[in-house]
From Swiss-Prot:
MF-aspect GO terms: lipid transfer activity
Cellular component terms per the entry's GO annotation: cytosol; early endosome
Primary location: cytoplasm
Keyword entries, A-Z: Coiled coil, Cytoplasm, Endosome
Encoding gene, per UniProt annotation: bltp3b
Subcellular localization, as worded in the UniProt entry: Cytoplasm, Cytosol; Early endosome
Disordered as annotated region, ranges: 267-300, 882-904
Superkingdom assignment: Eukaryota
InterPro entries cross-referenced by the UniProt entry: BLTP3A/B
Record-annotated Chorein N-terminal domain positions: 3-94
Protein name (Swiss-Prot/TrEMBL): Bridge-like lipid transfer protein family member 3B
Species per Swiss-Prot/TrEMBL record: Xenopus laevis
PANTHER family given in the database record: BRIDGE-LIKE LIPID TRANSFER PROTEIN FAMILY MEMBER 3B (PTHR22774:SF17), CHOREIN N-TERMINAL DOMAIN-CONTAINING PROTEIN (PTHR22774)
Protein role: Tube-forming lipid transport protein which mediates the transfer of lipids between membranes at organelle contact sites. Required for retrograde traffic of vesicle clusters in the early endocytic pathway to the Golgi complex.
Annotated GO biological process: early endosome to Golgi transport; intermembrane lipid transfer
Length: 1415
């Protein structure tokens, strides 16, 4: 009996072992136990059984002792146990892939029989190994793996031990069975060390990794008829890992991986070409004759339960998975290494990388038609990637159709060789799994296989990369450098922090047919990056050293660098709630308004080199390109200041080619540059031809760490959409040149045939574009350049105007930013810190590599149509009762309430009853002529007496009733908002009337929530343009403090001309939309305006501040609550200067160390808002407005042109410019109005705490007019108002030299390469001292001074005298000088008379308004 059993054992084990004899088997038949000693396993059989990759081969396997135990009576429920004591395996890597693996001996053991009892018993064997030692010898290193307590056993679908009958799920209808196995071990020890030889002496540290208990879960799906494995799923699960690597160990790992990369790549290609399609095709249901009927019959309910269970655990395709619950990786310097050839800037550094729930999935044989819903961890990210990939495949199918037709046209005389339709080959929405095999290929052969794809999916649930820590720093927990903010943003926990999918396409039988390009999808969610100087410098040196050692290793072992860096890959990167923090590196005395850093954030970001995503399509590039072309600044022919002749071409033709799809492979085929073929690389392109598009849905910048912000970020730049387009012209042209140099693709065709072929293709493409345009119904504003196609026919050459990288940055909407003095100082320090980091990085590159960094050339074009720059300045003095600016009120709500003892500041409170009464008074005027609604001129001034205030009230109001209302308001402690609306100086329109009638027409008082009142900003014939209506923001008031009725407060005081312009008072854009919809035709209050350029002399005007309250609109906020007390309000007050900037054109040229910034601003409109509550202003401004009122008109010439040169090339201007830069600025045709206090505050704003660096500069001002109003406090209230000053500057040149001195001249500097225009020959500084509100202004004289510029000085007269015509006339020099003086006097008198006429006109208009009110 024992002999028969030994023969059977030898029969089966001889397939796995070598030199096995009966004397090596000790068998106990009755106990079912046996032992084998000194077993030598068959290497090839073991390779086939383990299905090892072909780049790895087994040389020898030895086992000292094996024991087996067979439960004879329980074979159905209990497994056969096989125990091995010690297994030693020797392996080696193959430089060339070995032959593919054969069938597994487990399959052939039953003689290709059906899945029966014997197969179930063999498959249920459990294996345990005490110790396994695997030694691997590679080309450059030796490695060893030691595993202890390895166990392999069968489990149920819940991965638990149990009856063998429950470890498999069998589906007779499909003819398939699922089995589940688990492999675990106690410990694994991995060690790798470099091979030392006399030929290759390399300093390398051994790499060691020790892991704790881990396991592998395997699910197999077999066919019942032949036991072949149809699909399998393997999950490698690792528990917490802690790995400490020095830089030398990490370099060794990279070198070892590099040495294996070539062999692994060849093996992968071999595996793809030999992949069996039958293993991936769905198995048809087998007949009842193919499967043995089970011994016991089952009920339909049981069958349904089994089918459901099979579907739940079905393995639809082969996949491999790696799951690491937590990984802590520590990278540190190797302080004992002696191979360092450079001095480290940061020594003894260490960095910790912490990863949670890291998963890596690999699907080697995926069919696109099967979908991805069965993938592990399938979620929204995979859905997004699938929809994007479907669009890519749809475009590829279209190109295949056109390529098929091109091949047919290319070979019209050849026999009928049709090619398969793209829909048949790849499917309508992907790779079609039901390919019609009846379709012949290009050579009359049926397609052998369907295309497959291999996908890698990497997911990272959460991670933290900490800043570098050194031994000399204090002991504290390290701060994060890169982290995920899912918890703080309340994002779903199942959302991955990083999601990456990489997909390649191939034919399993290696068919030579076009395949789509690989695609890479990356999703980044809630990531936060913190710029740390020490970490950046340490990482820079660490990576440079790693790269340098890898290059030396490749050269030493003569490894081929066959990386596919030039191969095009379709890439898309999605970002959600990304944040980049730049902290201040220089610590200074911390002021409450001093930021600790700035944060750059975006709500959603999309970056792609494909045109299948929103805001990244060719039509978007076409629209942006057209916006840039609307400005001459971006033209390559624009060489005047601030641009120059050697500047880069910002609008490179590559962008235009790409917008019109003239840079594709199909376009080259249409042009006859490439012959049409149906091979694998027929539609492949180079990565050098990629055009990148990056779109930010919302992009904003905040200040971080401001103490006065109470832990909240403070807005720096409000959110706005932002688009960036990037191309690489030099790489593009080099790639195109290589394509053209490969030879004439049409050399086998005669010239006439080639011409006919290209002509046919072009006509077909034009017809297709024509009909697609007609169907689309869209006309492209940007016409195709006729030179685009012609330029492609010529060999491409690199021009001096071509940079390595061209960038177009386009801001679609209005931008608003605000900054105060301390934030400005912080930005200067931040700029110095970043500059220092860049310099250190550059020095480290030269130190490590031993050569200077490559000189990159970058061109950046930025287009911003409009922006508001708010300067938060020191508050204006409040003790001046006659100040032109309001002392307490502001265009934004100011909730400071004066006490009864302090009196009232000129505010009169009127409730709804008064509004209703007054409606009848002014209704007739409104019906008659809306423009005749004018106000009285009460000439109100600040007073502390309520009686005086009521005496100066308008005559149509009841003083007693108003006084009662005022006292009631003060008694309730109601806070009063003061929204100072700017009024026209020439036409004093009654704002109160418009507010009494307009709300009633819109039914504001009766119609519920969010109906804030809108005021039409009144127009005047004396203002330069008609400005759009704006609404008054009443947010920020605590709701519980809002009165239910509508309150209107009046405040009249003297205003400067700068306040006469119509300001854009901001509110929520939603309220603006609602109010404009509800408007009932009150737009008639806007009238046409005349040019304001002639009004140089101010007149007294009274303005009204109207506050509209709606209880349902009032919102409680911490800022309003904090401003309840007057003391807090005074500390919170700041004066605000808003610079409305229109038409910002910027070009940046970077050439190595040199950088040139050219800026051109079309128009700047200052707007002085006066004292404003800072937090109230920040909360109530309108961040979403497009500010169309400031962008309707563009000047023909820019007001400000600026050029800043940085780098060694600036030395041509001055020696100091090479270090600190050189600034050139031209201000022309600038007209504005300023208060003297505002100018003083601006000086304090830009004043630095430390001694600033001297920057040489040249500034020229031409045809500028500045209106100055002195609003300084008066010593005595009876003193007359200060006299306004008008500065007219025709030509002024200011130069700052290296010693810091300023030189001021009246002549332009010819070194500025700009055509300075001069309208007159003299520069005049005119001072107007007349009082604008005087009734007898004709008798007043005006003081003026006149300065003569150098280019009209007397030394030029001899040149005129030398003229023969003047000599013939007998005119002497003295006569000319005398005539010149007379002309000067006449000119001065004329200007004086013109000014007096303007003032007389203003006086008459003012008196006319009084007459209307008295009537």
């Amino acid at each position: 009996m024992a002999g028969l059993i030994k023969k059977q054992i030898l029969k089966h084990l001889s397939r796995f072992t070598k030199n096995l004899s009966p004397d090596k088997i000790n068998l106990s038949t009755l106990k079912g136990e046996g032992q084998l000693t000194n077993l030598e396993l068959d290497e090839e059989v073991l390779q086939n059984m383990l299905d090892l990759p072909t780049w790895l081969a087994i040389n020898k396997v030895f086992c000292n002792k094996a024991a087996i135990r067979i439960p004879w009576t329980k074979l159905k429920t209990h497994p056969i146990s096989l125990s091995l004591d010690k297994v030693i395996m020797e392996m080696s890597t193959c430089e060339e892939p070995r032959s593919c693996n054969g069938p597994s001996p487990l399959v052939t053991a039953s003689g290709q029989s059906e899945y029966g009892f014997a197969e179930k018993v063999v498959e249920g064997i459990s294996l345990s190994v005490n110790s396994i030692i695997i030694r691997i010898r590679a080309k450059a290193f030796n490695a060893s793996f030691e595993l202890s307590q390895l166990r392999i056993y069968s489990v149920n679908p819940s991965w638990q031990h149990g009856d063998l009958r429950f470890t498999r799920i069998q589906d007779p209808q499909r003819g398939e069975v699922l089995t589940f196995k688990e492999i675990n071990w106690q410990m694994i020890r991995i060690e790798a060390d470099a091979i030392q030889s006399c030929d290759h002496e390399i300093m390398s540290a051994p790499v060691r990794l020790i892991t704790n208990q881990s396991k592998i879960r395997i699910t197999l799906k077999r066919r019942l008829k032949d036991c072949n494995v149809v699909a399998s799923k393997l999950i490698f699960m690792l528990d917490d890992l802690l790995w400490v690597l020095t830089d030398s160990q990490l370099k060794a790992m990279v070198q070892y991986a590099k040495s294996l990369s070539e062999a692994i790549e060849k093996s992968t290609e071999q595996r793809k070409s030999m992949a069996s399609e039958t293993t991936q095709s769905p198995t048809p249901p087998v007949s009842s004759q193919q499967v043995k009927n089970p011994q016991t019959s089952t009920t339909p309910e049981q069958n349904n339960a089994i089918l459901k269970l099979f579907r739940d655990f079905d393995v639809k395709e082969t996949s491999y998975h790696l799951v690491i619950s937590h990984l802590d990786l520590h990278i540190c310097d190797d302080i004992h290494s002696k191979e360092k050839a450079f001095v480290r800037r940061v020594t003894g550094g260490a960095m910790q990388l912490s990863f949670s729930q890291l998963t890596v999935d690999y699907y080697p044989y995926h069919r696109e038609g099967d979908g991805c819903s069965h993938w592990m961890h399938y979620g929204d990210a995979t859905k997004t990637r699938c929809s994007w990939a479907q669009e890519l495949l749809h475009e590829f199918n279209s190109n295949i159709e056109m390529l098929r037709q091109a091949v047919k046209d290319h070979n019209p005389s050849s026999p009928i060789r049709t090619v398969p339709n793209a829909s048949q080959q790849y499917g309508q929405t992907g790779f079609d799994q039901n390919v019609k095999r009846s379709s012949p290929t290009a050579f009359g052969e049926p397609p052998k296989s369907n295309p497959l794809s291999s996908s890698f999916v990497v997911r990272l649930a959460d991670f933290n990369i900490f800043q570098v820590s050194t031994a000399d720093q204090c002991r504290s927990s390290p701060k994060t450098m890169i982290s995920c903010n899912k918890k703080s943003l309340y994002l779903p926990q199942e959302m991955s922090a990083i999601h990456i999918e990489f997909t390649e396409y191939y034919f399993p039988d290696g068919k030579n047919f076009p395949i789509p390009s690989p695609n890479l999808y990356v999703q980044l969610n809630a990531l936060q990056f913190t710029l740390d100087e020490k970490s950046v410098l340490w990482l820079n040196q660490f990576v440079l050293d790693l790269r340098q050692s890898l290059d030396q290793f490749v050269a030493m072992y003569k490894l081929s660098d066959n990386s596919k860096s030039d191969e095009h890959v379709d890439i898309r990167v999605d970002g959600l709630m990304l944040k980049f923090i730049i902290p201040s590196q220089k610590k200074q005395d911390c002021h409450p308004d001093q930021p600790a850093g700035i944060s750059i954030q975006t709500s959603e970001m999309i970056g792609s080199n494909t045109r299948q995503t929103a805001n990244c399509r060719r039509s978007d590039l076409e629209a942006i390109f057209q916006d840039f072309k609307d400005y001459d600044f971006y033209s390559k022919n624009f060489t005047s200041f601030p641009r120059s002749h050697d500047h880069f071409d910002i609008l490179h033709p590559i962008f235009q080619r790409h917008a019109f799809e003239q840079d594709t492979k199909m376009h080259d085929i249409y042009k006859g540059l490439v012959a049409p073929t149906l091979d694998t690389n027929a539609l492949s392109t180079s990565a050098a031809r990629d055009i990148w598009a990056i779109h930010f849905t919302q992009f904003w910048v905040d200040y971080e760490g401001i103490k006065s912000g109470k832990g909240r970020p403070v807005v720096f730049i409000d959110s706005f959409p932002f688009s960036i387009w990037i191309c690489q012209p030099r790489r593009f042209l080099q790639s195109q040149k290589r394509t053209l140099c490969d030879g004439d693709p049409l050399q086998s065709i005669s010239k006439s045939e080639s011409t006919d072929f290209v002509g046919r293709l072009q006509r077909k493409k034009l017809l297709k574009q024509y009909y697609s345009t007609e169907l689309g119904g869209s006309n492209t504003p940007l016409q195709k350049s006729q030179s685009l196609d012609s330029s492609l026919a010529n060999p491409p050459t690199c021009k001096q105007t071509d940079a390595d990288i061209h960038v177009l940055a386009h801001v679609q909407k209005h931008v608003s930013l605000q900054i105060n003095h301390y934030q400005y100082i912080f930005l200067l320090l931040l700029q110095e810190s970043i500059k220092q980091i860049l310099e250190n990085v550059k020095k480290d590159v030269e130190e490590v590599t031993g050569k200077p960094d490559d000189e990159n050339k970058i061109s950046v074009g930025l287009l911003l149509k409009s922006a508001d720059v708010s300067l938060l300045l020191l508050p204006l003095p409040e003790d001046n009762s006659k100040s032109p600016l309001p002392c307490e009120g502001s265009p934004v709500t100011d909730h400071k309430l004066p006490s009864p003892s302090e009196g009232v500041t000129g505010d009169l409170i009127i409730n709804n009853n008064v509004d209703l009464i007054n409606k009848a008074i002014f209704e007739s005027d409104l019906k008659g002529d809306p423009q005749k609604i004018v106000a009285t001129d009460p000439l109100l001034s600040k007073s502390s007496s309520d009686t005086e205030l009521l005496k100066r009230s308008p005559p149509y109001l009841d003083s007693t009733a108003d006084k009662d209302l005022l006292e009631a308001e003060l008694a309730f402690g109601q806070q009063i908002d003061r929204n100072n609306l700017k009024e026209d100086p020439g036409a004093n329109i009654d704002i109160s009337s418009s507010f009494l009638i307009h709300p009633l027409n819109n039914h504001i008082n009766s119609n519920g929530p969010d109906h804030a009142l809108a005021e039409d900003q009144f127009a005047s014939p004396l203002l330069p343009e008609v400005e759009k209506k704006q609404l008054v923001d009443t947010s920020g008031i605590p709701k519980e403090r809002c009165l239910p009725n509508l309150s209107v407060s009046y405040k009249n005081m003297k205003r400067s001309p700068s306040q006469f312009s119509l300001d854009n008072i901001s509110i929520d854009s939603n309220l603006l939309d609602e109010q404009m919809i509800e408007s009932d035709g009150s737009d008639h209050l806007e009238v046409g305006m005349e040019d304001f350029s002639s009004l140089n002399y101010p007149c007294t005007a009274e303005t009204s501040s109207v506050e509209l309250r709606n209880e349902e609109y009032c919102v409680s906020s911490p800022d309003a609550i904090s401003a309840e007390t007057s003391q807090d309000s005074r500390q919170d007050l700041m004066s605000v200067l808003v610079l409305k900037v229109v038409g910002i054109n910027c070009g940046i040229d970077i050439k190595g160390e040199d950088a040139t910034i050219c800026l051109q601003i079309n128009r700047v409109v200052p707007n002085q808002l006066g004292n404003v509550s800072v937090w109230q202003y920040l909360n109530s401004r309108n961040t979403g407005s497009d500010q169309k009122s400031t962008t309707d008109e563009r000047k023909s010439s820019p007001e400000i042109s600026l050029r800043l040169e940085i780098g060694p090339s600036a030395r041509r201007h001055s020696p100091l410019a090479a270090e600190n830069g050189f600034l050139q600025c031209n201000v022309s045709n600038f007209s504005s109005e300023f208060l003297t206090s505002t100018l003083a505050n601006i000086h304090h704003f830009v004043e630095e705490d430390s001694v600033p660096e001297i920057m040489p500069m040249k500034i020229q001002v031409q045809n500028a007019r500045i209106h100055l109003q002195d609003d300084s406090p008066r010593n005595n209230n009876t003193d007359p108002d200060p006299e306004p000053v008008v500065l007219n500057i025709e030509n002024l040149f200011v130069e700052r030299r290296d010693d810091g001195s300023f030189w001021i001249r009246g002549s332009p500097d010819t070194s500025l390469n700009s055509p300075w225009n001069h309208k007159e020959t003299s520069s005049i500084l005119q001072l107007d001292c007349s009082k604008s509100h005087s009734t007898n202004s004709k008798s007043k004289t005006s003081k003026f001074t006149q300065t003569i510029s150098e280019h009209t000085s007397l030394p030029e007269i001899p040149d005129v005298i030398n003229n023969q015509a003047w000599k013939a006339a007998g005119i002497s020099k003295e006569q000319l000088v005398e005539e010149n003086e007379c002309l000067k006097q006449e000119l001065a008198k004329t200007k004086m008379a013109l000014a007096e006429s303007h003032m007389e006109r203003d006086r008459l208009l003012h008196q006319l308004k009084r007459v209307h009110i008295e009537k």
